[in-house]
């Protein structure tokens, strides 16, 4: 399981990064979600790695 936490604001992100955060369900700063560890989730995290904090 992977825990993803939004630590930086979505303001100033490009539309693709915003859609990725929406797909991850992260809307507010300090919001956390837990996901299964798979390639799809890892790819989404890679697109917004500068905005999130990942814990395994």
Swiss-Prot record:
Transmembrane segments: none annotated. Keywords: Ribonucleoprotein, Ribosomal protein. Disulfide bonds: none annotated. One of its GO terms (cellular component) is large ribosomal subunit. One of its GO terms (molecular function) is structural constituent of ribosome. One of its GO terms (biological process) is translation. Belongs to the universal ribosomal protein uL30 family. This is Large ribosomal subunit protein uL30. It comes from Oleidesulfovibrio alaskensis (strain ATCC BAA-1058 / DSM 17464 / G20) (Desulfovibrio alaskensis). The lineage of its organism: Bacteria, Pseudomonadati, Thermodesulfobacteriota, Desulfovibrionia, Desulfovibrionales. The gene is rpmD.
């Amino acid at each position: 399981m992977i825990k993803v936490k939004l630590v930086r604001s979505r303001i100033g992100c490009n539309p693709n990064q915003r859609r990725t955060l929406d797909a991850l369900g992260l809307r507010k700063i300090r919001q956390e979600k837990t996901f299964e560890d798979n390639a799809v989730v890892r790819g989404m995290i890679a697109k917004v790695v500068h905005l999130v904090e990942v814990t395994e």
